[in-house]
Structure formats: C-alpha cells, structure tokens
Amino acid sequence: MPEAHTKHPRGRPRFDPSCLRAVWFEEGDGVALVDEEGLLAVIPGWAEADSGLPGYAREAIGRSAYAWELDSVRGQLWPRVVHAEAYWDWRRASGAWRSVQRTVLSHLNRQIGEAGHYWDVSDGHPPLLRVSERPPTEGRPFTVLSTVGMCGQRMPTLDRYMANTSQHARVELALATTLPAHHAARIFRWIGAFPWRAVTWFGH
C-alpha cells in the first residue's frame, strides 16, 4: 500500500486470525472481511481492479490501485453484510429449502396445473435446484418444465447495471416442449446454475 494511502504508513500490529471472518454476499460475487470492530475490507460485486476499483479497506486513505477508503461507503456496505450473514444463517436452517420449494410449487400448481415428474438437477452443489414437470392437458398439448429453487438466491452482478435490483435478482426458468420431458429437462442441469458458475445474470 502506498504510504500516502494508508492510515498506518509505519505498519500496525498483526491481526488476530481468530477474530476475523469472511462473509460472502448472498449473490456470491462479493465478500467482506469482518473483525471485532466491524468491516475491515470489502470486495463488492461491482469491484473491478482493471477498471481502478479493487475494493475497500478500513485502513486505506483516498483511492489507490490497491484499495479505496472504506469510511465513505461504510454506511452503504454494512447493511449488505448484515443481510448476507442473515441470508446464510437462513440457508443453513433445516426448513429453508422446503420454504422455497413450497412457494414455487404452489405458484406452478395455481398457474399451470398439477405436477408430474420431479427431478434433482443440482448434482449436490448449491444452490439446490429441481425441475418440475407439468404434463400436457386437454387444453395444452405440450409439457411445461420449470426450475424450482433458483429464486432462493439472488443472481450476481446486477449491482453493476442498475440501482434497484429487487425486481430482477430472483428468477425461475421454464420452457414448453413436446419432446420427452426427461430429455428436455437436461438443459436445466447446465443453465439452472449458470448465473452462479459464470458470475452473471439472466435478463441482460
């Protein structure tokens, strides 16, 4: 860190590792380092070192290629970290997945009709992802397949494109097909987790 851009140009005592914890943002595209005094450093989802914003640090002054000062944005970032910790606590709770599943399936039952087959396409990796089949009916000569679980986690990188992400951050995907359902459903094994694997979002 350049001397002019740190609060401790002569160095400071080593941090106690037992007092440090990393908190990932819900989207998975940012992380905060927290100690007993609060935020120590944050690399948010909109940080891009190549564009001159490497992240924020409590010990930084002004802006440098290594870190921007955290003091001026602490009020904006701290609620995000609090939300993130609450989100991961919720995700670890035993009923979290069931609540997402129940909400999505109830919506599909009301809007499309009764379910058929149900597949796990997450391969054991988060976020948990299922596919629900709605077989053809007398008035609908095609099958509707829908993901179940994507909406349980916000998609990454929306903060780079819009100020209010609330209407775009959570999605489920669906398709209509006349192909055998178990063949068509395979696309969701790849595309369902794509936003978190590729650190992007659907809706560009």
Short names for language-model regions:
Residues 1-204:
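Short linear motifs embedded in intrinsically disordered, proline/glycine-rich low-complexity segments
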